[in-house]
Amino acid sequence: MFSEVKVLQIVLVQWLTLFSFTYNSHGTYILDGSAVFNENSYLVLTNTTKHSYGQAFDNTTFEMKDQSFSINFFFAIVPEHKQQGSHGMTFAFSPTRGLPGASSDQYLGLFNKTNNGKTSNHVIAIELDIHKDEEFEDIDDNHVGININGLRSVASASAGYYDDNDGSFKNLSLISGKLMRLSIVYSHPDTKLDVTLCPAEFLVPPRKPLLSLNRDLSQYVLKHMHIGFTASTGSIRALHYMVLVYTYPEAVYQPLEFGRVPTLPPYPKKPSDRLRTVLAVCLTLALFAVFLASGIGFVFYLRHKKVKEVLEEWEIQCGPHRFSYKELFNATKGFKEKQLLGKGGFGQVYKGTLPGSDAEIAVKRTSHDSRQGMSEFLAEISTIGRLRHPNLVRLLGYCKHKENLYLVYDFMPNGSLDKYLNRSNTNENQERLTWEQRFKIIKDVASALLHLHQEWVQVIIHRDIKPANVLIDHDMNARLGDFGLAKLYDQGFDPQTSRVAGTFGYIAPEFLRTGRAVRVKFF
């Protein structure tokens, strides 16, 4: 009935995509890459390693130039995990008995990065592609394509077929695990190539092909070509089954029928996998017992010691986000000493990383009953908590837990300005600021003050500007921070100062005389 019939079967090997088939003679095919014959006379195109490829090309030649032909083969892909395939395979016409230098993964064991797309390849392939590669402009991860000299298909369509009865399109999944038939028919007088996909139980493919290409293939091929298969694996595992049938060298749809469509075996498991499964079950039960005991213990713990985080009246009007104590505890690794950035009369500042992200933060912890602790805490939240400016340290949120108050800021990797200005003997390696950097820092602080005094809806008086409160970010931009002594006023309101606030240091002469500051200085 057929000029030549060759049955292809897969060797079931776990963890990898394998293409295997038996046929009349070992000498019929030339193997390359990972392709080998195993002890059962099966041809395995890929071995048990990831990112491998294999090739099997017929040693005899097939006359294609100015010729018609019809080729059919049956295949099935059984993935290890549902809805996840590998990269796919191709049926190819090649001028040589193999394709040297081919690569795995998206190159399907057919081409490589260098020769992909070159007209000198003289290769025509039908790809069964189950991985969408943007590099090759794939339409999806479940399609059939016609490729000429490269992996960017000249024609492609999602896997499926057109019903002969009503003409509707029926989708097929290439990784469904079901046996399918692919028919390739080329008519030389019409220079038309038709590719049709359908279920294996169809005696004859549907009349309307899935793909059609009106092109004279003689311009791309040599007179004599070799027929073969290529396949590649990536990091996703699956099993690929194929049954290949060569039909007459004519443009006909040859009836093909199985006595019974083969039932594909389930995905295989090695003996070691059974042991691994038993161990996994035992480990799961043990972990479940541990978690159950831990959960019961945690419930009893909560009954005796509850950490309540209830919003107080003053928090309702606050702008920034409230963090839970647990978030800050985990971020700072339990407020460990090695996370400490600095400390003083205000409390301690710790470095941390927010759980679930790479965002670095600085957490300032002060005591609720410390000197001006609560008032400074509220001042920070009510002022900088609602401000967003590139030269102001951003307050991300706050937390109140037991006797302690916490403020969360963006982390400034270069620390405060005073460490650059006051270089001690123990910090002689600290880099010096250039005059350009110093001038930029002055402008940054001025920009922050302009925003506070004139640009925002209210006037904010910082009242404690000093090098220790000017922080430097990773780009050496200055940011003004520590608004614990800040005061809010409405625009146009003239505040009456009753006492000096801030850190002792330089005090303007008018403060000593009147207790009030003026904008203009005379020296």
From Swiss-Prot:
Topology with respect to the bilayer: Single-pass type I membrane protein
Keyword Signal attributed: yes
Domain Protein kinase: 335-523
Reaction it catalyzes: L-seryl-[protein] + ATP = O-phospho-L-seryl-[protein] + ADP + H(+); L-threonyl-[protein] + ATP = O-phospho-L-threonyl-[protein] + ADP + H(+)
Keyword terms of this UniProt record: ATP-binding, Cell membrane, Glycoprotein, Kinase, Lectin, Membrane, Nucleotide-binding, Receptor, Serine/threonine-protein kinase, Signal, Transferase, Transmembrane, Transmembrane helix
GO molecular function, one term: protein serine/threonine kinase activity
Enzyme Commission no: 2.7.11.1
The keyword Membrane is assigned to this record: yes
Side of membrane Extracellular, spans: 28-279
PANTHER family, alphabetized: PTHR27007
Name assigned to this protein: Putative L-type lectin-domain containing receptor kinase V.6
Gene that produces this protein: LECRK56
